[in-house]
């Protein structure tokens, strides 16, 4: 005797060797012997063989009309033999019974199991939903096959193009677009990136890196919601006798800082460092704050930037010339002769901004000799530079002194051997680049007088405010460095600690609240300190050991690293483009590091580091012949 039985979701057949009350010993056609529970046996028969019965039953089941079978089936619970009798004939054959069993078992959208060989009809609405889902699945599979075929032929379907960066970097492996790429990649034996490049999905190397950056850091886009900058409610006093001026480049719209000098010739000079004060109007948790916190910083890249705050908000608080602007001011008093710091004071006030100086327009005029020797004149000296010449001269003298004092603490001079490089995309005018623009690269010597004036003033403000918050027990976001020993990096934390690299006792970023979120957070803390003094720790928005402050620190670190990494990658991209556009095939370079099979070199006149073949001593000067610049440009963001 043979039996058909269910085992682990399958129907198997075999010859009965022996049988007890509740089970049977069955030999399969493979020769394997198994113990089968009696309840799992659904058919007993003498002939044909189990293999023949199963094959005939499956073939017959495939021809059954499931809609008709569902109509014929009883409303209550029924067995497969009952359906065979209703569907085929009153006395169905063994093969017909097996066919009914297989059809019922393999159509769960029509019939639900009610036991071994027992079933119930699914409700009509469930059947319709299931059939619709099956049809949808078939349509999706057909679409996947069609898209995969197009990709293999070098054509990129629009839906795949729209999901390109998600497919490459954060795929939904159940999405049909992803499955189409996988199928096409398998069929064509090409890597997904190569496949998509060949299909024209990637417009250009620049667009690839740009869209990837946006996908990873701005998945919802770079636009802003509709926001209104709140007015500052405080009645702020006017800074009497102050004529402040900012020093930035011509592309800067987020003018965070300005300087003023009072008391020249009196023996005591007061230097004012005036910082834009969005913190006087924006509150932690407000809609604008949430936008700033999500971005953490303005993103800079050659020819373009993504601002932390909307232009309308920046315009409300920026230190634009010709008006009295709200500011958080640090006044530092110095002995005019010795330049010894005598005292500091913080004020919340309105500051008259007399001028916005632009160093790219003034660097050729405002030189160290011009600042130190009043007899030197230039015919083309801008009126603003001439107007503030005495103040700039004092600030430059002070900046050199402050730098020298820091270098004593630091233990060695700061190195300004390499210049800053400025990138300009011709005809871009601040619009989003395409990657095809003509690029100009110019240099600006680090430590130039105007640069030195601004940097030393900001270090003075950041270190003074950082120390003041620490004295009051008010937490902030600090940057510190334990020593200048190799491997000791700058870290961020919430406590005032020394910064060995700068040579200061503490350093809290506070001077760029329109473009760095850390500075806005610190400004809230500084405002609380200015208003409440010794009780500021109780009134400040962020308290000691505030979990939210640590969350901000962590988020800022991650965002700032990503933004700087992208900026560096794009500067490399445009440098390679510059080489290509200018037809430069050789570069003067200096070896900076040994590599296993060569050396790493830095170009002497461009912001470019690259490997060369052959062992070279560190510091050696080389003339390097370049090759494959166009290909390298495609890796600009790596």
How would you name each of these model-derived features?
Residues 114-129:
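Accessory beta->alpha helical hairpin/"wing" motif in late/C-terminal subdomains of nucleic-acid enzymes
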Residues 5-9, 17-22, 27-32:
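N-terminal basic/disordered segments at the start of proteins
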Residues 97:
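Nucleic-acid-interacting cores, centered on viral/eukaryotic replication and modification enzymes
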Residues 1-8, 589:
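A short beta-strand micro-motif
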Residues 10-12, 19, 31, 39-41, ...:
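Electropositive polyanion-binding surfaces
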Residues 143-243:
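Low-complexity, highly charged intrinsically disordered N-terminal segments
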Residues 127-149:
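Short, amphipathic alpha-helical interaction segments positioned at domain boundaries
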Residues 105-117, 202:
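A short, conserved structural fragment
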């Amino acid at each position: 005797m043979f039996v058909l039985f269910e085992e682990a979701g399958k129907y198997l057949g075999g010859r009965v060797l022996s049988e007890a009350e509740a089970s049977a010993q069955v030999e399969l056609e493979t020769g394997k012997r198994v113990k089968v529970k009696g309840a799992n046996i659904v058919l007993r028969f003498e002939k044909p063989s189990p293999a023949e019965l199963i094959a005939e039953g499956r073939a017959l089941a495939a021809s059954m009309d499931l809609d008709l079978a569902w109509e014929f089936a009883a409303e209550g619970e029924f067995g497969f033999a009952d359906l065979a009798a209703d569907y085929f004939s009153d006395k169905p054959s063994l093969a017909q019974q097996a066919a009914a069993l297989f059809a019922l078992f393999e159509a769960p959208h029509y019939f639900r199991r009610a036991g071994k060989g027992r079933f119930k009809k699914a409700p009509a609405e469930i059947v319709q939903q299931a059939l619709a889902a099956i049809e949808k699945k078939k349509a999706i599979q057909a679409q996947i096959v069609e898209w995969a075929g197009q990709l293999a032929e070098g054509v990129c379907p629009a839906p795949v193009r729209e999901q390109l960066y998600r497919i490459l970097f954060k795929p939904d492996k159940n999405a049909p677009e992803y499955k189409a790429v996988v199928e096409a990649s398998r069929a064509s034996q090409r890597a997904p990136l190569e496949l998509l490049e060949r299909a024209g999905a990637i417009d250009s190397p620049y667009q690839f890196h740009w869209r990837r950056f946006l996908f990873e850091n701005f998945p919802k886009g770079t636009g802003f919601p509709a926001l209104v900058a709140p007015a500052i409610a405080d009645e702020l006093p006017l800074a009497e006798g102050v004529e402040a001026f900012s020093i930035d480049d011509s592309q800067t719209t987020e003018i965070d800082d300005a300087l003023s000098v009072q008391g020249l010739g009196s023996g005591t000079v007061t230097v004012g460092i005036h910082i834009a004060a969005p913190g006087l109007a924006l509150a932690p948790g407000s809609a604008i704050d949430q936008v700033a916190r999500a971005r953490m910083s303005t993103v800079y890249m050659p020819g373009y930037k993504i601002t932390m705050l909307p232009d309308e908000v920046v315009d409300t608080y920026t230190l634009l010339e010709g008006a009295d602007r709200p500011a958080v001011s640090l006044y530092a008093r110095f002995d005019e002769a010795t330049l010894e710091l005598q005292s500091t004071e913080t004020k919340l006030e309105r500051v008259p901004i007399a001028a916005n100086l632009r160093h790219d327009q003034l660097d050729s005029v405002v030189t160290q000799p011009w600042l130190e020797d009043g007899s030197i004149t230039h015919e083309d000296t801008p009126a603003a530079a001439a107007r503030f010449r005495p103040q700039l001269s004092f600030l430059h003298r002070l900046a050199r002194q402050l730098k020298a004092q820091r270098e004593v603490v630091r233990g060695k001079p700061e190195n300004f051997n390499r210049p800053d490089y400025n990138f300009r995309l011709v005809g871009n005018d601040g619009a989003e680049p395409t990657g095809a623009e003509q690029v100009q690269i110019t240099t600006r010597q680090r430590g130039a007088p105007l640069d030195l004036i601004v940097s030393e003033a900001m270090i003075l403000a950041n270190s003074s405010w950082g120390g003041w918050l620490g004295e009051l027990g008010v937490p902030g976001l600090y940057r510190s460095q334990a020593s200048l020993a190799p491997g000791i990096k700058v870290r961020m934390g919430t406590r005032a600690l020394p910064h060995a690299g700068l040579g200061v006792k503490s350093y809290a970023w506070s001077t760029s609240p329109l473009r760095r979120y850390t500075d806005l957070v610190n400004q809230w803390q500084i405002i609380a300190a200015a208003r409440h003094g010794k009780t500021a720790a109780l009134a400040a928005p962020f308290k000691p050991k505030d979990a939210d402050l640590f969350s901000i620190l962590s988020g800022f670190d991650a965002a700032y690293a990503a933004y700087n990494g992208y900026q560096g990658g794009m500067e490399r991209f445009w440098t390679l483009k510059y080489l290509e556009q200018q037809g430069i095939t050789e570069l003067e370079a200096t070896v900076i590091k040994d590599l296993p099979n060569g050396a790493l070199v830095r170009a002497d006149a461009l912001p470019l580091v690259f490997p060369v073949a052959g062992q070279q001593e560190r510091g050696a000067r080389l003339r390097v012949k370049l090759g494959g610049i166009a290909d390298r440009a495609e890796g600009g963001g790596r």
